[in-house]
């Protein structure tokens, strides 16, 4: 696992032509897709294999016992985002309770906020479909994200 969280909580995203609408600005639904992809990339950069978190991966002998469905998402658009823009993306994970967490995604263009996205996940048993504790791998990722960050008492 990587100790320096800036390598897995601070990412970049180049806006591609296919991400934009007829007006040449980012189509609204792309933001939540980017949020989820950034979370996946963050887990990967941190050192977690996709098979440890996501079902259906190639070569996976057994699916994870715990699923992490998205139960809430939100996006705020502050400024237009155009094709070719190189965005900085900062992730701030937060454990909400023993079975859920949320990731805040902050998108910046030239150090100016252009959008924010939030995605909330709840851990459920794949067998019973009832809430369960977060998987150990996600717990480690959440704990590591707190290192060097001041949190409220």
UniProtKB/Swiss-Prot annotation:
Per the record's keyword annotation, is Ribonucleoprotein included, yes or no?
no
Query: What Pfam families is this protein classified in?
Result: 4HBT_2
**Catalytic activity reported:** 1,4-dihydroxy-2-naphthoyl-CoA + H2O = 1,4-dihydroxy-2-naphthoate + CoA + H(+)
GO BP annotations, alphabetical order? phylloquinone biosynthetic process
InterPro entries per UniProt: 4-hydroxybenzoyl-CoA_TE, DHNA_CoA_hydrolase, HotDog_dom_sf
Active-site residue numbers? 21
Aminoacyl-tRNA synthetase as a keyword of this entry, yes or no, is: no
Q: What class of enzyme is it?
A: hydrolase
Q: What is this protein called?
A: 1,4-dihydroxy-2-naphthoyl-CoA hydrolase
